[in-house]
Amino acid sequence: MKFVDEVSIRVKAGDGGNGCMSFRREKFIENGGPNGGDGGDGGSIFMMADENLNTLVDYRYTRHFDAERGSNGGSTDCTGKKGEDLILRVPVGTTVIDSATQEVIGDLTKAGQKLMVVQGGWHGLGNTRFKSSTNRAPRQTTPGKPGEQRDLKLEMKVLADVGLLGLPNAGKSTFIRSVSAAKPKVADYPFTTLVPNLGVVSVDRWKSFVIADIPGLIEGASDGAGLGIRFLKHLARTRLLLHLVDMAPLDESSAPDAAEVIVNELIKFSPSLAERDRWLVLNKCDQILEEEHEARVKEIVDRLEWTGPVYVISAIAKEGTERLTRDIMRYLEDRADRLANDPAYKEELADLDQRIEDEARAQLQALDDKRALRRSGVKSVHDIGDDDWDEEDVDDEDGPEIIYVRD
């Protein structure tokens, strides 16, 4: 199934049903009173998180959704039927954003969680509602209110405990294959991984965590190069980042330079995400002589001025992977205990999570705007020169502003 993590849709709640104007008509009752019923409320639209979904592809081709309209009221004080609510199922981890205001309407992070995105219109009133001591035969009704309408942007972020960072061919997919049952594609060319992959790592019978592998980053990714920048948002909700570095690149490039590229791109994308706990994992140690390990490790650590945990592994030979996964499990358990017992730490992490979300959304929006300008043939706003303006266009200062964009 095709992986889609961003879509734009339009949702329209049902209109409320109109009130009815009716009068009682029975044998021997010549002037019966009003008996027009109210209309039914319009149906609302909800988003529901479904743990069985892992893509938004269903909304790629069907983009307009309308809830049912409420029925009109009837005679004999019959109230119209309420419009049926519409439930749109999305993957767990989906954020719902109002496209017009960029306001985050809600975040669906738990299976079964529901979120109302547009509310159905209120019902209209029948003429029975307007009966009074001075108006015994009212001919007044009200129409139903229109339902809300919104343009929404749905963003899905995979929910994982641990995220993998690295250049293409750093061995991320091989690592996730070696520690979990996931089987992402592995090959000896860059960008083998085109979409995020998830794997469940079982440390023992009762303990496990989820690890996410995203497409590799390259230099300039924060400016739109490669594939990784749009997938970096999937690491926003991870608890720990693993920075994988190839200790023995086939092209004989510098491992310290490669490690530095990832750090720089991460900071450019989101300085707050760079503050997330991160471990350095040096992969493919089986490709170099054992006596060279210490020198290679020191070279990379010194270049990054690294002070955090460092692991030397071989994912394909499964050397050092068991120790790494057990340490990750221990870290996640300690983190959960501290969150439960330390309110200040919990508040600190919540603030960090919010900053990461805001920075990631702003970065991706800026990238989308840049791509839109490229498609229109304009590299930037500054490319529109003075010769592109016509003095006649600015005679009416109160008129609409007209901007010309080169095709």
From Swiss-Prot:
NCBIfam families: Obg_CgtA, PRK12297.1, PRK12299.1. Residues 385-400 have a biased composition (Acidic residues). Disulfide bonds: none annotated. The gene is obg. Its cofactor is Mg(2+). Keywords: Cytoplasm, GTP-binding, Hydrolase, Magnesium, Metal-binding, Nucleotide-binding. This is GTPase Obg. InterPro entries: G_OBG (IPR031167), GTP-bd (IPR006073), GTP-bd_Obg/CgtA (IPR014100), GTP1-OBG_CS (IPR006074), GTP1_OBG_dom (IPR006169), GTP1_OBG_dom_sf (IPR036726), OBG_GTPase (IPR045086), P-loop_NTPase (IPR027417). GO terms for molecular function: GTP binding; GTPase activity; magnesium ion binding. One of its GO terms (cellular component) is cytoplasm. The keyword Transferase does not apply. It holds the Pfam family MMR_HSR1. Residues 1-159 form the Obg domain. GTP binds at residues 166-173, 191-195, 213-216, 283-286, 314-316. Belongs to the TRAFAC class OBG-HflX-like GTPase superfamily. OBG GTPase family. It is found in: Cytoplasm. It is an enzyme of class 3 (hydrolase). Its EC number is 3.6.5.-. Residues 160-333 form the OBG-type G domain. An essential GTPase which binds GTP, GDP and possibly (p)ppGpp with moderate affinity, with high nucleotide exchange rates and a fairly low GTP hydrolysis rate. Plays a role in control of the cell cycle, stress response, ribosome biogenesis and in those bacteria that undergo differentiation, in morphogenesis control. Mg(2+) binds at residues 173, 193. Monomer. Residues 129-143 have a biased composition (Polar residues). GO terms for biological process: ribosome biogenesis. Gene3D superfamilies: GTP1/OBG domain, P-loop containing nucleotide triphosphate hydrolases. Residues 128-148, 376-407 are annotated as: Disordered. The keyword Cytoplasm applies.
